[in-house]
Amino acid sequence: NLQKIQKLLQAKKYSNIILEIEAHTSEKNRPAALHNLLGVCRASQRGRTDRDAQYALNDFETAFYKDNLGQISLDALCSHITLCAELGRKESDLVNNFLVSEKMYLEAEKKYSKNERYIGYGLDLYKYLLKHKERISKVKEIIGIKGLDKMFGTILIATQMYLNDWSQKDFIEFQKEFSKLFDVYNAKRISKIDIGKKVIKVAFLSPDFFKDHSITYFIKNLIKDLKQTKFETHGISLLKDKEHDDTTEKLKILFDNWVVVGEKTDQEIVDIIQKLNIDILIDLGGLWSASRINIFNTRMCPLQISWLGFNNSTGLKEIDFILADINTVKEEEQYYGTKIYKFPKIWNSHCGIKNKR
């Protein structure tokens, strides 16, 4: 029977595997490995229903406890967290399911506290539970094991922003070390903006031009207004084509030019921006994980600005200034590490929300 199951698994015939296991084993005598496999098959089968997903979570939980913190326990725990994350907001029992994950996670801590995989899955668990202190603790554990890198440095900064318990001095000192990891890409030399030109090209770079993201409510009218002036507007999306949606399409038509770079390398993005001869490049994502902010460690355009998506300094030397006002930057200005241009009234331009979000 095991050989048959193996062949079915290779053929990805998950429904057949479920039938085979249930026909030849009972809940009582079924070993942890088969419970875990049942969970994987229920979660992976085509046409999976909410009921299938809940059964899969139950199988992972059973496998975890039957294996008594062996390797299968770790596999089942990770699968449980992964499936909870996949279900997302569609699943009404999301929080309850994640609380089960957390219970198992804490029970496994003594055995797996130094295991990188265990720690990594803790990041996802505490992200969805909105337990930011616990998530920061896990990030620091990984950094302690592997050293600081771009991904975990970004996660640490982003999570820390939710807590707001870093002083600006602490933040900028960390960012100085973090920014040393960013590469400098090949770029042609550029000259200053010719203000006398008939058209000045301004580009907005973002990973958030989709899903009714709040960014879109701040820039829609701005883009419309810029089109009435001497500015030529370029939208540069860091998403992949398949990630775009109706929100993207509505935003796309507002720009004079639209470029998708989600599948490009950092060097390719730099090359594209320079070929467009952009005069002013505005980053809308800052240090959030999907933003590709590291390309701003390279001088691509005469003027490079950070605004809106990340309300703090990026600490990168090739960003000329951040846009703010007297309300967003009040104290510790000397610790921002980037010049601050303060608008006289307010730093953003909200367009209003018609629908509840």
Please report, for each region that a protein language model flagged, where it lies by residue.
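Alpha-helical solenoid repeat scaffolds of the TPR/TPR-like class and their adjacent stem/linker regions
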Residues: N1-R357
